[in-house]
Amino acid sequence: MHRSSQTVRALLFDLDETLLDGSRLQESIVRACDMIAAGQPGLEAARLVEANNEVWLDYWPEVAEKWTLGALDGESLSLEAWRRTLRACGCHDESIVRLAARIHRNLGREAHRLFDDVRELFTSLKSARVPLALVTNGASDTQRDKLRVLGMEHWFDVVVISGEVGIAKPDASIFRLALNKLPAERENVWHVGDSLTTDVAGAKAAGLTAVWLNRSGLVRREGDPEPDLEIRSLSNLMAFISE
C-alpha cells in the first residue's frame, strides 16, 4: 500500500468503531431486557432479547437510510424498536415502551467507550495543533449524545454528521463539507476510518488520503476499495504525522 508523500495539514476521523468501541452494545440490550422483565410480571428477559434481535433484523433495513440522512431521529428509532419488541412479547403498554427505551438509552451510554489508543493520539494531535474534523454517519441526536457523554465535543474543529446535512458517506460531498471548513488543501488532508466501503471509498472519491484502520486484521477481498495506508492501531498514526 502506498501513502501520500504530502505533509499532513489536517485529519478527518470516523466515529463508530474507529474512535468508539461498540462491542458492549449487545450486552447493554441483554441488561436492559433483564431490568425490564424484572419489573413487569409476564415478561421474560430471554424472550425480550430474542424478540429485540428479530425486530432489528426486520426494522433496520426499513429505516437505516432515514436514520442516516436525518429523516428519523435516534429517539424515535429506539421507541419504535422497543414498541415492536414488547408487542411481540404481548405487551402493548406505551408507558413500558418509554421505560424500556429510557433504560436501554442509559445502558447504551455506559456501553460506549473509547478505544484505548484514542486519548493519547488526540492529546498528541492537539499538542501538534493539527486541525481535526469528525465525519460520521448517523442521526444528529444519536451522534451528538455520544460526543457529549464521552467528553469529545471540544476535540474537533469541525463536526459533520450525516443526519444534519442530509448527505452520508461514501458520498464525497460530505467529506468536502468538512474540508471546506479546514485550513488545508485536500492533498494534505487524511481521513481515518474503519470501513472500506464508506470511509476509504468516500475519502478517495473526495481526493483525500484514505487511511484504513483495520483493528481486527481483516483481509481485503478482490474489488474492495484500496486504502492509501492501512494501520492496525491509532497509535501507529502519529509516526506518519510527525515525519
Enumerate the language-model features and the residues they cover.
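N-terminal helical cap/lid subdomain that shapes the substrate entry/recognition surface
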Residues: S5-D116
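Asp-based, Mg2+/Mn2+-dependent phosphohydrolase catalytic module
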Residues: M1-L11, G22-S23, L43, H92, ...
